[in-house]
Amino acid sequence: MAIVKVTDSDFDSKIESGVKLVDFWATWCGPCKMIAPVLEELAGDYDGKADILKLDVDENPSTAAKYEVMSIPTLIVFKDGEPVDKVVGFQPKENLAEVLDKHL
């Protein structure tokens, strides 16, 4: 599955079931650009097991504030609508896969 962009208005409905890795990012963020290809690979690797979502914090500040996102990129794993794990900053694919695997 491709990465899905989410907004403040549809965020809750997109995370309500299953395992989701949400990338809180911004267009001007260098590390966010570095992690983008890693997330594309994960989206392919975890197709059918977990979804990768992206939320632009500049365009959607309410959701970022709700989950206390202070630095970007912040990646939060949600399981059935609840946050279960959080990683801040660039991470290699192996680290993110390990985080996701804990919640599948």
From Swiss-Prot:
Annotated organism of origin: Staphylococcus epidermidis (strain ATCC 35984 / DSM 28319 / BCRC 17069 / CCUG 31568 / BM 3577 / RP62A)
- Annotated Thioredoxin domain residues: 2-104
Q: Name one GO biological process term.
A: cell redox homeostasis
- For this chain, the annotated S-S bridges are C29-C32
* Membership in a protein family: Belongs to the thioredoxin family.
Q: Which portions of this protein are annotated as coiled-coil regions?
A: none
| Top-level division of the source organism's lineage | Bacteria
For this protein, what is any one GO molecular function term?
protein-disulfide reductase activity
**Would you name any one GO CC term?**
cytosol
Checking NCBIfam families in the record gives: thioredoxin
Q: Write the protein's name.
A: Thioredoxin
Its gene name is trxA
Keywords on this record?
A: Disulfide bond, Electron transport, Redox-active center, Transport
